Amino acid sequence: MSFWEKGHGQPFTAWTLLLLPFAGTPLLAQEFPPGYLDPGPILAAAAEAIGTDNLRCVTITGTGYAGAVGQQRLNDKNVDWPRGDPLANYTRTMNWAAGTMQEAFDRPPGKNPASWKYGQGWLGGTPLQLNSRQRFLVNGEFAWHLDGPDSAPVAAPPRDAALWQLDLWINPHGFLKAARLPGANPRATWRWELGEMGRDGPTTTPEKMTIVSITMFGKYRVDATINKENLLQRIHTWIPDPVLGDMNFEHEFTNASYVDLGDGIRFPTGWHSHQGWDDNYQMQSINAGHNGFGGTFDRIQPNECRDPVTVPDSVRAATFPVHVETEEIAEGVYWLGGSSHNSVAVEFEDFIAVVEAPLDEQRNLAVIEAIVQLIPDKPIRFLVNTHQHNDHIGGLRTYMHIGATIITHRLNYTFYTRDVLNYGQRTLEPDMVSLWPPTELAEGYFYEQVAENYVLSDGERNMNIYYVHPLGHVDGMLMAYLPNEQIVIEADLFDTHLPLPATATDANRSLYNQVQRLKLDVATIVPIHGHPVPWSDFLDVIGDTSAE
């Protein structure tokens, strides 16, 4: 069954688009409710202004930037998503008639997950990028990436594939074509807008804008802000995020960036994309990350569709089951792997403590089910959270749902209470807390904040929890230590899913120094990324410590 047959709309073909020209709503103007406008003439004027009917596809080239959503060192005002190396020789081909998009760029290898393009989707514990040239492709419900020119295609998970397909249409021509598709149901309104504080100066004269919203794939509500020149300057929607819920997603384009390509076609050269609200001083959130992608792409080839994007058989056949492997690494201590991110369950006399709730709710529900099978009839009383990167906290709400108390560093507390563990809307991918919210988050025993150290104990078994610093990677990092078992449990400080490094990293040395300062007796290190290994393997990486 195809993407379109599954209820995501009709195939995006030129024939379909021609069948549905913009038409004014056959109602008298006064029959629209107050505040609403007829979207037909607005969309038709915008399409005429930029020559949408004359553009079937486009290839753009330039230099871009990539923001790693959820990988900031800390959550605070004016702290954006971290940016890595530029996306050099960036090329994007968008073929709206076929519903396909190709992106390619050069980026230094060895620093980023191979599966990560930009914005959402950064996952530690996954294979690193090995080659400079990267390609990302989407055709309908299928998406994949290629790490280097001769590499095998690797299928993208459904959440990434859906976002890449949506992104094909979040641009001026894409939006106007999508507005003609069956089920789009355009609606329009208007408002006055002033310039942005701090960017556009002390603007006092507002501009009247029209906003047209459409429905895409029966799921996403997408709106475009159109100015008096009939140019689309902002295209906005929401996308699902395991941590933040319904997440702001938008592209912005200035009037000056539109260039004339001939045949009545105009296309923007400057792209500015937000994943997260572009508002450093909003009151409802702590996190201020927003710049996920952008750049100048001023080499534009209209109606250059390039080769067809054919879905590889391996991608078409790919599945993404949630698999949990379990191993008892010490009496009552269970490693729960089978994914890019692990969890560890520790049995106490009358409760269970779990270290780490990564990725998303689906993963953590499977882990919780495995724990219940391993240790029946005891409550999961505590969830120890190592740090606040998105790929490590996607299951916090799942543990809140089952009644666990979350132990985290005090630097993470305000971000969690304001942005993550809340009653915020989650309409695109409802989770357990949004479907069955607890009576009162404010009165529940949901948090323990750690400053320097914390101990969980039943009188026989102890779990010591320590603040790890300094770190350039993140602030608010915790590690767990089981003294009786001589086990250290840590995240991102020493990973074993890849070949061990030839020389120690700064994070490796911070972990080593922490263990030395605290005089911990360690036999086994249990990373969140990778399998447990003897402490001696870690010391081999650290090397000569006689001078330390």
Name these PLM-found stretches:
Residues 512-548:
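Divalent-metal (often Zn2+) His-rich catalytic cores of metallo-beta-lactamase-fold enzymes
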Residues 31-41, 119-221, 239-247, 311-315, ...:
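Flexible, processing/modification-adjacent segments and terminal tails
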Residues 203-309, 478-483, 490-491, 496-516:
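Gly/Pro-enriched, hydrophobic low-complexity segments
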Residues 327-371, 477-495:
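Conserved beta-strand hairpin/beta-sheet module of binuclear metal-dependent hydrolase folds
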Residues 282-349:
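Zn-dependent metallo-beta-lactamase
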Residues 45-48, 52-150, 186-197:
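N-terminal mature ectodomain segment of secretory-pathway/periplasmic proteins
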Residues 13-26:
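Bacterial N-terminal signal peptides
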Residues 362-407, 517-521:
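Active-site metal-binding motif and surrounding structural segment of the metallo-beta-lactamase
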